[in-house]
């Protein structure tokens, strides 16, 4: 199974820490949105799209990439993120714009992953930030289990 992770990780590299776990389990390549040639994505069996959450959505570079993707048929993908706040409804909302863009292009979103990340944006920097130490060992373990499940379900 040939896998790719399209990652934009900024500030504290929270999402990159999660992507590194996925990379090992899925034997995947990691590329930034700027490194992607949309026409070459057909070479991959599974593509993960992830970034931190900014203003309730994935980073603009990831969303812009999704807009440029060619139409596909049932290409398997998953979405991942890190953010200051999580919870089932919050994650569903945060992932909704990227999910919709990918689905409109023909991608099947087979699963989604999110966890808390250290955040010092805005006024939080004056208080030492939020979620210091996240993603932590438990978050990384959950990321590994998530990737193992993806791998098993696709074989």
Residues covered by each model-derived region:
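FMN-binding flavodoxin-like domain, especially the glycine-rich phosphate-binding loop
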Residues: 3-4, 10, 16-17, 21-31, ...
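Short acidic active-site motifs
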Residues: 35-39
């Amino acid at each position: 199974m040939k896998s790719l992770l399209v990652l934009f990780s900024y500030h504290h590299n929270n999402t990159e820490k999660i992507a590194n776990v996925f990379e090992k389990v899925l034997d995947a390549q990691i590329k930034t949105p700027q490194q992607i040639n949309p026409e070459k994505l057909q070479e991959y069996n599974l593509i993960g799209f992830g970034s931190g959450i900014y203003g309730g959505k994935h980073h603009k570079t990831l969303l812009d990439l999704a807009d440029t993707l060619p139409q596909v048929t049932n290409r398997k993908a998953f979405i991942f993120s890190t953010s200051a706040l999580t919870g089932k409804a919050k994650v569903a909302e945060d992932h909704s714009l990227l999910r919709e863009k990918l689905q409109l292009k023909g991608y099947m979103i087979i699963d989604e992953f999110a966890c808390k990340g250290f955040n010092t944006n805005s006024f939080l920097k004056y208080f030492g930030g939020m979620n210091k130490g996240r993603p932590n060992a438990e978050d990384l373990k959950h990321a590994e289990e998530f990737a193992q499940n993806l791998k098993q379900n696709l074989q």
